[in-house]
Amino acid sequence: VTSQVPILTAPTAAGKTALALALSERFPLEVVAADAFTVYRGLDLGTAKPTPAERRAAPHHLLDVVDVTQTYDVARYVRQAEAAIADVLARGRVPLVVGGTGFYLSGLVRGLPLTPPADPAVRAEVEADLAARGLDALLAEVERASPAEARRLERNPRRVVRALEVHRRTGRFPGEFGSTVPAFAYRVFAFTWPWPELEARIAARVGQMLAGGWPQEAAWLAAQVPPDGDPRPTVWQALGYREALAVHRGELSPQAAGERITLATRQYAKRQLTWTRTQLGAPPSSPQAAVGALGAWLGRWPSGEER
């Protein structure tokens, strides 16, 4: 039985990459990214993807694996991440899963739901309902059948459509189908900052990204994948890209865009913290405590600690 694989998770802008790189100076680490948008080639600035220099400092896996015109989902992520973890372990090094996409982390830790494959006809029907009646009406439909499922979907249109597509076909929601068995056991190390500090970090990073070429990156993305396609393209669900595009087009000032993106990012960070506590069972500590605990645990790796 392989020892537990460590996961380092924190909300957006908390400094996960910096912390992982600091640990890589002390341990033979390779980073396995767990982020729904750094998988896309060309989405660099707006996703705060590790820079070439950071990627030279420690090997990174699961970055730049698909083109923006391609679809990518949690099942594909889990397959590729498990293959990367196995490869790192086979070379006698330590895989450190680093990221904040809760859905991806849950797929690794808890397995993938054994839901039926998509049915394009039913999905088209649900998407037509979404366009005609709006998200709230669809969420109300879920709520009537299962309040817990409605909460779990977090107002994410893509997940609401998927849940209703499955429910209308089977009478069950995706979470009711059970899951695959995870390939590895994991140990989650979660951290965050006091909320005012995290808010300040988010605002500062959004400002830097908008000044550093994000609007141009959003314009490049729009040329590859029109933002208003139907169904809504997955890549355009990445936070802030629509606002960055509006800056490029002269429709929003950088300041107004920054305020909107900062607000949306703060809301996302709160959802990430909730997911970490409720779905991963890992109450976040301070960055200092997390790096101390993870460093001590890595010092005992591969035995680590038994659960």
Can you describe what each PLM-predicted range is?
Residues 1-307:
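Phosphate/pyrophosphate-binding catalytic cores of soluble transferases and nucleic-acid-acting enzymes
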